Amino acid sequence: MKASMFLALAGLVLLFVVGYASESEEKEFPRELLSKIFAVDDFKGEERGCKGFGDSCTPGKNECCPNYACSSKHKWCKVNLGK
């Protein structure tokens, strides 16, 4: 039952995309649509001045972002709970 509902929904979505693509004047629409669906986050490539949650760090160097602290036991940035 669940599989048939999923297939019906997927078929409707596919029908909508194909119908919209056929009405589109641009011939690059399917490629453009796929690139937007599977786009990679651009901000992940940017470097920060500090390290976020789970990044490796050296205790005592204050490398972690605000609200994070370098764990001396595990040597990675974790949430600073004020202890």
Swiss-Prot record:
Q: Which UniProt keywords apply?
A: Amidation, Disulfide bond, Ion channel impairing toxin, Knottin, Neurotoxin, Presynaptic neurotoxin, Secreted, Signal, Toxin, Voltage-gated sodium channel impairing toxin
Tissue expression profile of the protein: Expressed by the venom gland.
Q: What are the disulfide bonds?
A: 50-65, 57-70, 64-77
Its subcellular locations are:
Secreted
Q: Span of the secretion signal? A: 1-21
> Propeptide per record: which residue ranges?
22-48
Which GO cellular component does the record give, naming just one? extracellular region
- Family annotation (Pfam families): Toxin_12
Q: Does the keyword Transferase apply?
A: no
MF annotations from Gene Ontology: ion channel inhibitor activity; sodium channel regulator activity; toxin activity
Residues with the Leucine amide modification: 81
Into which family does the record put it? Belongs to the neurotoxin 10 (Hwtx-1) family. 15 (Hntx-3) subfamily.
Role according to the record = Lethal neurotoxin. Selectively blocks tetrodotoxin-sensitive voltage-gated sodium channels (Nav). Does not affect tetrodotoxin-resistant voltage-gated sodium channels or calcium channels.
What is the UniProt domain comment for this protein?
A: The presence of a 'disulfide through disulfide knot' structurally defines this protein as a knottin.
Q: Which proteins does it associate with, and in what oligomeric form?
A: Monomer.
Identification of the protein by name: Mu-theraphotoxin-Hhn2i
